[in-house]
Design a protein with these regions (language model features):
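Glycine-rich loop/linker segments at domain edges
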Residues: 6, 12-15, 82-85, 161-208, ...
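Flexible, low-hydrophobicity surface segments
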Residues: 1-160, 274
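Catalytic phosphate/nucleotide-handling subdomain of diverse soluble enzymes
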Residues: 462-524, 539
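Thiamine diphosphate
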Residues: 232, 253-276, 280-283, 495-503
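C-terminal catalytic domains of large/alpha subunits in multi-subunit enzymes
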Residues: 67-68, 239-244, 274-279, 308, ...
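Helix-loop-helix junctions that connect adjacent transmembrane helices in secondary transporters/permeases
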Residues: 147-238, 403-481, 623, 685-706
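Conserved catalytic cysteine-centered active-site region
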Residues: 85, 97-98, 241-249, 273-284, ...
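Short acidic, glycine/serine/threonine-rich loops at helix termini
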Residues: 74-79, 120-123, 222, 231-233, ...
Length: 764
């Protein structure tokens, strides 16, 4: 390989670091309607009346839309970016008379500028009938208070949903007789773990610009991971034909799953469609904190059984998930809590995985990197660490005895074959990187501080089997350079670069010879979007196949121009050469072939390929943390984090490494500081980055990432995914290190200094 597995610079790097205008607010007009949302101060209420008379008298105000402008009996929609028919229920209206959380939309205001809209918003008078909210997700199921009592609530997929029970989803699956196996085990770990809701906290908040184009269609320019899904979502919300909607995306200032939900597009789309005037919405940081789509709060009851020799024989997991006021991604995230944690332990004779996803009057949850696997892995990996403690075994050793291996069937992973796996090598690599034998479990530093280590494993997937679709179009232009058209959305991950690397490898050309254009529903080939760790594996494979097809067409036209058969020529990326026959040795360069294709030619130098996969090969990761705990204050200092990742072949080692480092940093925040909490009225407490504590550079210590490459035969050049698996190991690793330092295991995140200090006092 010459281009793949090379640490090449991102194509857009210079534009980003020099501050060029590349984001939504940079590339869209300022002289458009400013759109803002009046939001509910109540967790559960009915809007009795809205008086907008005074507000509309403010100079510059264009329109104020309320529930009276939306058919309350019309078909509902979901904002979840998922393939149709979505697993997420259709439970939203653009503006609903029934508001279901603090921050839900009461009115859409549009005016000439932000100043007049802000003034008008203060003059809108709303009368509410305040209802009792459901705030505790433990009591939501079959609660007499219904979050969605409406008759036009709809579930399109068989996910066990029932709005009359506050159930967004329910599922049960298993293999073997788990109760009999657990009854026969020498040791059973029976614990309940709780993970909090967390914000993605991307730098660029939700934002969308809308206009009516030359053909009278709605053109949406949005910071989104899902242009094709957004087209469907907006069409469903506005009850207009999809042919009337075009969605494009510029650069994205971070997404991490938040922008797999169309959280902002619907509202300016509604304004522009109604007024026929361009409009723009930019969420404030407060709005992105109180009305976005954070990680699902989950509670996991784990029963893990083993023999006294450390062999894990059975895992029983029940997950309760809080989807909040609306069901975006609720039915799908919960599945990963079991199906991306239990399969790590290949020796288990039986498993059972059950789940409930419930509605509450909290902010609607959504997609966040890790997508449910993060929560489940914290629970299962913590249980395995506790098992090691009880048996007096080394946590690395107990995993070496139990892990899945290449070539094994994984019953808890939908019965899929483990086609590529370097998990054993990842374990050995991290064991040495962290110097485990000399540091485990802890060392008293003699100054009131204790240093300790902990570890954990993780897996994820590479796209959604038999569902995700990736496509690529490649064409040859004048002078022989290429254009790569994709529907995947580069949200900082670098897929515009890595997909071009795959094409360049096949076409044997420098990376700069390929121009990447992405994510426009009018001219991009269809792509499900950038989520579910699918882009490299699914769209990357489409790109590889597309480049191979185009290469064949180049050879065919070159052979025609050279007067021989296609089978007689070769192509080295620069020229087509006749290898045999009477014209052997004759050549024609790519530039001349490209020029000839534009004059009297019937062989199109363009190819489009679509790809979907029947398997989703997991990437694997092992992580180990070294921390220092101040036993008096409870402060945790992360000294070192060592990780080894099996993502198959890294297409671009630089981008792969920073993906891993960023994911680890987010996992550190979830473990130690980040949390979405509410007061007893359902009001969110962390409405800014002062209250919501994401880790700064000084908080994450030294992060070291290395790679143990397997080779996935179904992936492009052996590649699997990288984007999500990297967030999962800090939770069990750091929490286990804290246990080793202070002698108490914490079952609820985040583990704050206050919790540790209180535990130390209780111990004394």
């Amino acid at each position: 390989v010459k281009v793949v597995n090379q640490p090449l610079r991102k194509k857009d790097a210079m534009q980003l670091v020099t501050g060029q205008p590349v984001y939504v607010d940079d590339v869209t007009p300022r002289d458009c309607l400013c759109v803002k949302l009046l939001r509910s101060p109540h967790a559960n209420a009915i809007v009795k009346s809205i008086n907008k008379t005074a507000a509309m008298k403010v100079p510059g105000m264009e329109a104020i839309f309320t529930w009276e402008d939306v058919d309350q009996d019309g078909r509902r929609y979901t904002q979840a970016g998922q393939t149709y028919p979505e697993a997420s229920p259709y439970d939203r209206l653009v503006i609903d008379r029934h508001v279901r959380f603090v921050g839900d939309v009461v009115a859409i205001l549009a005016g000439a500028d932000e100043k007049c809209v802000d003034k008008a918003m203060k003059l809108v008078k709303v009368e509410y009938e305040v209802l009792e909210p459901v705030l505790d997700f433990h009591t939501a199921k079959d609660n007499p208070v219904l979050v969605h009592p409406e008759d036009n609530w709809e579930s399109l997929a068989p996910v066990g949903a029932d709005n009359r029970r506050n159930l967004c989803a329910h599922d049960e699956c298993g293999n073997g007789d788990i109760d009999a196996v657990l009854a026969d085990c020498d040791v059973v770990i029976d614990r309940v773990y709780h993970t909090q809701a967390c914000q993605q906290a991307m730098m660029e908040t939700f934002r969308t610009y809308c206009e009516i184009d030359t053909y009278g269609r709605l053109h949406i320019i949005s910071s989104t991971q899902i242009v094709f899904h957004t087209r469907r979502i907006v069409a469903n919300a506005l009850h207009i034909p999809k042919s009337k909607v075009r969605v494009t995306k510029p650069r994205i200032g971070g997404g991490f799953g938040a922008k797999q939900t169309a959280g902002s597009a619907v509202y300016p789309a509604f304004v522009t469609w109604m007024t026929k005037k361009p409009s723009k919405i930019i969420f404030s940081r407060v709005e992105s904190q109180i009305a976005s789509s954070p990680r699902h709060e989950m509670e996991m009851h784990v029963r893990l059984g083993a023999n006294k020799d450390g062999i894990v024989r059975g895992i029983d997991l029940h997950t309760l998930s809080n989807t909040g006021a609306y069901g975006e991604h609720g039915p799908t995230t919960v599945g990963l809590s079991g199906h991306k944690s239990i399969p790590l332990y290949g020796k288990a004779e039986a498993f059972r995985f059950t789940s409930d996803v419930v509605y509450t009057n909290h902010m609607s949850a959504g997609a966040y990197r890790g997508y449910g696997a993060t929560q489940g892995l914290f629970a299962v990996e913590s249980a395995v660490n506790e098992l090691a403690n009880i048996l007096g075994m080394d946590p690395f050793k107990i995993r070496e005895m139990n892990i899945t291996h290449e070539g094994e069937i994984m019953p808890a992973y939908y019965g899929q074959l483990n086609t590529s796996c370097a998990l054993d090598r990842c374990l050995a690599r991290v064991h040495d990187m962290i110097d485990w034998d000399n540091k485990y479990p802890c060392r008293d530093m003699g100054n009131g501080k204790i240093r300790a280590v902990g570890m954990g494993m993780a897996m994820q997937g590479s796209g959604i089997t038999s569902m995700d679709v990736g496509s690529a179009t490649l064409k040859v232009n004048d002078e022989g350079f290429y254009t790569l058209l994709i529907g995947a959305a580069d949200m900082g991950t670098g897929c515009d670069t890595t997909l071009a690397q795959i094409a360049a490898e096949v076409l044997e050309c420098p990376l700069d010879n390929i121009t990447t254009l992405s994510a426009d529903t009018d001219w991009s080939p269809y792509d499900s979007g950038s989520y579910a760790s699918s882009t490299t594996y699914v769209t990357g494979k489409a790109t590889e196949k597309c480049a191979l097809e185009l290469r064949g067409k180049i050879c065919a036209l070159g052979a025609k121009l050279l007067g021989c058969d296609k089978e007689q020529v070769s192509f080295d990326g620069r020229e087509v050469r006749v290898e045999e026959g009477e014209n052997a040795g004759k050549t024609i360069n790519l530039s001349d072939i490209a020029t000839a294709s534009m004059n009297g030619n019937s062989i199109e130098l363009q190819a489009t390929v679509t790809h979907s996969s029947e398997i989703s090969p997991p990437p694997y990761m092992v992580g180990a943390a070294e921390i220092e705990v101040d036993t008096e204050t409870g402060e945790v200092t992360l000294l070192d984090y060592a990780a080894a990742v099996d993502c198959g072949t890294p297409i671009n080692p630089n981008l792969t490494r920073v993906q891993a480092e960023g994911g680890i940093a987010q996992g550190i925040g979830m473990t130690l500081t980040e949390s979405v909490t509410y007061d007893d009225r359902g009001y969110p407490m962390e409405n800014s980055l002062f209250q919501y504590k994401i880790p700064a550079r000084v908080d994450i210590g030294k992060i070291r990432v290395e790679f143990e490459n397997s080779y996935e035969g179904e992936g492009p050049f052996g590649a699997k995914s990288i984007g999500e698996v990297v967030i999962n190991t800090p939770l069990p690793a750091i929490s286990d290190a804290i246990r080793n330092a202070v002698g108490k295991r914490f079952y609820e995140l985040p583990i704050t200094p206050e919790k540790i200090a209180m535990a130390a006092l209780e111990k004394k």
